[in-house]
């Protein structure tokens, strides 16, 4: 498959480029940066042996290169518009950018289906993180008192993380509604109890040195249960990205969540 990478200078995009180069059945045909200084990726020392054009305009890249799939790891500000542009050009998309609303996902799914092409948006491409979400969903049926703590590097732009939101959405499907905390609790400092989704509290930590981590903490009388996943390196996401790129060939719709393509 001929693959282009959008956001290739970001930490995740850089790792995706290296992954595409490692995979025998994937070919890196173009990369995209919002303000490129280079015309070819070989102007970067690490990739000096390659011949891959660098683009600053997504539509131009799609029309000139015609990739089979674009992997997008950019920012919430442009993630939706990028994905829409990719799909409207009839190109498959694998998107790790977060911040999509349910309405945006629905619209993008309609475009993918009208074009009969596959696409996948996932808040997390680590298989361990997907298992964490599935385990939490099962546990929430029996432990409705639950809070989420997500921890990421301090350059992450959105909060709470897409993984935390997806976890809460999945737990809400099996969990009896409980508004977490005392009915008359008072925040002495605004935001001390975190954000709220369906009565569950979500807390976001941003610190240097972290990559991506999440704890789902359940409490009940006389017992507690904690489900935690840690990504210590961005390589943890790459097997999921490569799997998703290949899977788009089999799809004619947009899938939200890596768990929906795992056997």
Curated annotation (Swiss-Prot):
UniProt keyword Cytoplasm, yes or no: yes
Entry's family note: Belongs to the DapB family.
Catalytic machinery residues: 152 (proton donor/acceptor), 156 (proton donor)
Intrachain S-S bonds: none
Protein known as: 4-hydroxy-tetrahydrodipicolinate reductase
Cross-referenced InterPro entries: DapB_C (IPR022663), DapB_N (IPR000846), DapB_N_CS (IPR022664), DHDPR_bac (IPR023940), NAD(P)-bd_dom_sf (IPR036291)
Binding site for NAD(+): 7-12, 96-98, 122-125
Record keywords: Amino-acid biosynthesis, Cytoplasm, Diaminopimelate biosynthesis, Lysine biosynthesis, NAD, NADP, Oxidoreductase
Record-linked CDD domains: DHDPR_N
A biological-process GO annotation: lysine biosynthetic process via diaminopimelate
Annotated pathway: Amino-acid biosynthesis; L-lysine biosynthesis via DAP pathway; (S)-tetrahydrodipicolinate from L-aspartate: step 4/4
Keyword NAD (UniProt): yes
Record-linked SUPFAM superfamilies: Glyceraldehyde-3-phosphate dehydrogenase-like, C-terminal domain (SSF55347), NAD(P)-binding Rossmann-fold domains (SSF51735)
Compartments reported by the entry: Cytoplasm
Pfam families the UniProt entry points to: DapB_C, DapB_N
Residues that coordinate or bind (S)-2,3,4,5-tetrahydrodipicolinate: 153, 162-163
Record function comment: Catalyzes the conversion of 4-hydroxy-tetrahydrodipicolinate (HTPA) to tetrahydrodipicolinate.
Any GO molecular function: 4-hydroxy-tetrahydrodipicolinate reductase
GO cellular component: cytosol
EC number: 1.17.1.8
């Amino acid at each position: 498959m001929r693959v282009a990478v959008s956001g290739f200078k970001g930490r995740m995009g850089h790792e995706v480029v290296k992954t595409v180069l490692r995979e025998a059945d994937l070919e890196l045909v173009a990369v995209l940066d919002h303000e490129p200084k280079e015309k070819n990726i070989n102007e970067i020392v690490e990739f000096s042996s390659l011949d891959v054009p660098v683009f600053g305009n997504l539509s131009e890249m799609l029309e000139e290169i015609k990739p089979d799939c674009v992997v997008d790891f950019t920012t919430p500000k442009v993630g939706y518009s990028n994905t829409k542009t990719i799909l409207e050009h009839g190109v498959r998309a694998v998107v790790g950018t977060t911040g999509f609303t349910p309405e945006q996902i629905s619209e993008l799914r309609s475009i993918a289906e009208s074009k009969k092409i596959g696409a996948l948006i996932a808040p997390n491409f680590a298989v361990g993180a997907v298992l964490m979400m599935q385990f939490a969903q099962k546990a929430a049926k029996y432990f409705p008192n639950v809070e989420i703590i997500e921890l990421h590097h301090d350059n992450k732009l959105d909060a709470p993380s897409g993984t935390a939101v997806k976890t809460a959405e999945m737990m809400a499907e099996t969990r009896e509604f409980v508004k977490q905390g005392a009915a008359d609790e008072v925040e002495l400092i605004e935001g001390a109890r975190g954000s709220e989704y369906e009565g569950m509290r979500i807390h976001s930590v941003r610190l240097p040195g972290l990559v991506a981590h999440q704890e789902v903490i359940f409490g009940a009388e006389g017992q507690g249960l904690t489900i935690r996943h840690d990504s210590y390196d961005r390589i943890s996401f790459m097997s999921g990205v490569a799997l998703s790129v290949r899977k788009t060939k089999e799809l004619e719709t947009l899938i939200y969540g890596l768990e929906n393509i795992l056997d």
